[in-house]
Each structure stands twice: as C-alpha cells, then as structure tokens.
C-alpha cells in the first residue's frame, strides 16, 4: 500500500454541520432571553434551501415558547445532538449550536410555508426520509406550532474539533466538493443499516483499517488520542462506529491504554447507504494482509 493524501477536514466538518441542521439528530430550542432557566423544547427541524431552519414543536403551556405570539421574532438558541447508533453505550458523534431569531407562523400561513419549502438536502423517494414530513406532522398535531429560525453562523463540535461556519458555507458544500453528488439524506433505517454493515466487517478488520489510517496507508486521519482513564474494561480491545456517511466512517478504537478516534475516508462518494459494507470490506481487505504478516 502507498501513502495517501489526507482529505479536507474542514469540508467534512461543514458536511456534518449541514447534516445536523438539515434534520439529523435531536434538536432543542431555548428562548434564552425571555427565561434562561426555562427548559428547552424539543423540536422537529429541517433546513430550507435558503438556509433558514423550519422547526415544529408542541411547547408546554406557560413556557416561553408557548406564550410567544405569532409573527414576533424571539431570540433563541438551537442545539442539535447526534449520537452514534452503537448499542449498549452512548457516544456523541457531533453537536451543533446556533443563536438566531425564531418567528412562529400564524395558522393560516403554515400550509403555504410548508408547501413552498424545499429541504437543503435531497432525499430518496423510496427509502429516504424528507425531514419536512416530520416537521409537517408535528406542526399539524394538537398544540403544534411551526416556526422559522433565521441565523448567520453555526458552531460545530465533532471528532475533528470545534469550528464555526457561515450558513452560506454550509449551503455551498456541494459546489465545494468537486465532482460530488448532491447531498443525500439517509433515513434512520438506512443509517442503522450502515452502522450494522460497519460492525459486520469484524473487529479484526476494523483494527487493521485503523492501523492503516494511523500509518498513512489508507485515506483518513486521526482526530484524537487520549488515555483510557475511566473507560469501562468491558470496552477494551473494541473498535466502535461513531458515525458513517457517504464520504467515510468515524471509528473509535479502545485499548486498555488509550482511546483513539479516527476518520476512514472512502475512495469515492457512495451513492447509497447500502454501499457502506462493500466499501469498508474492500479497505479491510487491503489492510488485513499486512497486519497479519506482522510477527
């Protein structure tokens, strides 16, 4: 195997920020200026093609988001958390945070707003989920409200570190990725299937891939490495999937001494979640022979 070029880490961070704002993960809104101590309201969310974020919620009576009138902008904080689909252990893959203005839409204007909205990411008409459908369902339910959040920047915390991005940069990510297909939104079922495909490669294959990335023999990069202080011994000698998308897989390799998180990049952007298994199996088949040949 020959050395490979390290991919653009900032581009991957922007793709992750777009995924989170476009509908992935769980989102919560806080009207921090009205009552900072009030609990956040969990919302369904989706980013429109113009960069504004649609949110739908059923805020409890008496809370700031319930009493805020329609048509009046309210300063809010939006927090989105994406957890790994790893059973038995909670791993936070990424979080996004932004400050913006939320305006609740009057009842008669909701249908028009939803009908004229287009999601920022494509979705598969067969198995993919349109995040706007979830927003529409919550907004039309008992006590449901529909609003639009306008913002300029988003702060992202992910395995590659902390970064800040303009909304315009996130919207332009497809044009920045030369030759890449438009962003595809995978359904929760597809994401779960992709995680299972990563696990199916097996611990030996995943460890070989991790070693090859660390040694610069497979595309990717090491995000962090820290002592395994406080890690449950039952997790030692395991490699777990933190996240997976069309561009690569984020793995966490745990030993009794250290915890290493790294990104494995695919040679080409995948057309669908069903290609994750074959793509990672191919990388493992490249890395395994050299690992097994070592004394």
Regions found by a protein language model. Give the residues of each.
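A generic structural motif
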Residues: 30-35, 81, 252-254
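Short, structured beta-strand-loop surface elements
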Residues: 51, 59-129, 137, 143-144, ...
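C-terminal edge-of-domain segments
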Residues: 114-295
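Short beta-strand micro-motifs enriched in acidic
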Residues: 46-48, 105, 254
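Short, surface-exposed beta-edge/turn micro-motifs
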Residues: 24-27, 50-52, 73-75, 143-146, ...
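N-terminal short leaders/motifs
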Residues: 1-7, 37, 46-48, 84-98, ...
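An N-terminal domain-cap segment
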Residues: 1-69
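A structural signal for short, well-ordered beta-strand segments and their strand-loop junctions
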Residues: 28-31, 79, 146-150
